[in-house]
UniProtKB/Swiss-Prot annotation:
Record GO cellular component, one term: monolayer-surrounded lipid storage body
Chain positions with N-acetylglycine modification: 2
Species name: Arabidopsis thaliana (Mouse-ear cress)
Impact noted for substituting residue 131 to V: No effect on activity
Superkingdom of origin organism: Eukaryota
Cofactor(s) essential for the protein: heme b; Ca(2+)
Similarity comment: family membership: Belongs to the caleosin family.
Modified residues (Phosphoserine): 225
Protein name, per record: Peroxygenase 1
Gene name per UniProt: PXG1
Catalytic activity from the UniProt record: RH + ROOH = ROH + ROH
Signal peptide residues on this chain, from the entry's feature table: none
Length: 245
């Protein structure tokens, strides 16, 4: 009876299934609770991980959800609405060139605007309403935001336990590609493309000198503090280029 109970307890906590090799190759972390309280609990205001259990030091949330914080950098006039020209300006502040910024801004506002509008009629100006940004969340993503725009710490940690094969806290370009492939939902073509574009842009923005994207850069991208930091670097206000490596 004892051995049967032990077997049931072991199976109940297993993260690898013998006949599902993918569960072996994409490991789940089981050691989060010691440094990150309740890693499974969605965080509305902060983006914590094991190394930063209280989120980004000094980053103000202003009562916004983590997903709202992620996009608020591009709200240049701080009125809760992001127009294409503001997206363009934000991209330029991050160091993207004119042509790239024009294309990226057009794609972002064209694809995200309608879902965030307060009514049914489309707008010719393609605004993105920050208070409705959770409605623009697409499939085939990392699930690090939940459907209400809260941050899921456990899913950030799973990105690295599953896909960081070279270094435990960094992803290579190939590992990023493998992650976006692993995130794909069936027949979700828009989500497949959107995921690769988003992660590709983040890689261009925040990769280190060795071509890796660090966990800290990714975490700070989720709460938007990375954009503020990179804008200061590009403007020459800050010289510390290693804060998120």
């Amino acid at each position: 009876m004892g051995s049967k109970t032990e077997m049931m307890e072991r199976d109940a906590m297993a993260t690898v299934a013998p006949y599902a090799p993918v569960t072996y190759h994409r490991r789940a972390r089981v050691d989060l609770d010691d440094r990150l309280p309740k890693p499974y609990m969605p965080r509305a205001l902060q983006a914590p991980d094991r190394e930063h259990p209280y989120g980004t030091p000094g980053h103000k949330n202003y009562g916004l959800s983590v997903l709202q914080q992620h996009v608020s950098f591009f709200d240049i006039d701080d009125n809760g609405i992001i127009y294409p020209w503001e997206t363009y300006s934000g991209l330029r502040m991050l160091g993207f060139n004119i042509i790239g910024s024009l294309i990226i801004a057009a794609v972002i506002n064209l694809t995200l605007s309608y879902a965030t509008l307060p009514g049914w009629l489309p707008s010719p100006f393609f605004p993105i309403y920050i208070h409705n940004i959770h409605k623009s969340k697409h499939g085939s993503d990392s699930k690090t935001y939940d459907n209400e725009g809260r941050f899921m710490p456990v899913n950030l940690e799973l990105i690295f336990s599953k896909y960081a094969k070279t270094l435990p806290d960094k992803l290579s370009l190939g590992e990023l590609w493998e992650m976006t492939e692993g995130n794909r939902d069936a027949w979700d073509i828009f989500g497949w493309i959107a995921g690769k574009i988003e992660w590709g842009l983040l890689y261009l923005l925040a990769r280190d000198e060795e071509g890796f994207l660090s966990k800290e850069a990714i975490r700070r991208c989720f709460d938007g503090s990375l954009f503020e930091y990179c804008a200061k670097i590009y403007a020459g206000i800050s010289e510390d280029k290693t804060a998120y490596y």
